[in-house]
Amino acid sequence: MLIYDSQYTPDEYAGVTGRSKVGWGHSTYVAGCELARSAGVGQYVLFHHDPTRTDANVMDLERRAQDLFAPSIAAREGLVIHLDETARAAWAA
């Protein structure tokens, strides 16, 4: 599982739709999808959403991420993730 700062879209990050966010310490959902795929993780969790986003905006980003890396979900208030024994053993190693 990868829980990754996915605050911006690529256009927001690059400054296409406003001020560039490069160097602000955040990332994009696309970079998260690429990292999840290259690392071979089983689940990607988009985390640290831009505070100006509505729930509908976050759901849209979740769908976009799923188009790039199917096992993607957006973190949301109240989300609980249960790890199986294999994941717990890997975490402890």
Predicted feature descriptions by range:
Residues 1-77:
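Cap/insert and terminal regions of metallo-dependent hydrolase folds
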Residues 78-83:
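A short acidic, often aromatic-flanked loop/helix-cap motif at beta-alpha or helix-coil junctions
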Residues 84-93:
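Short, surface-exposed amphipathic charged segments that create phosphate/polyanion-binding patches used
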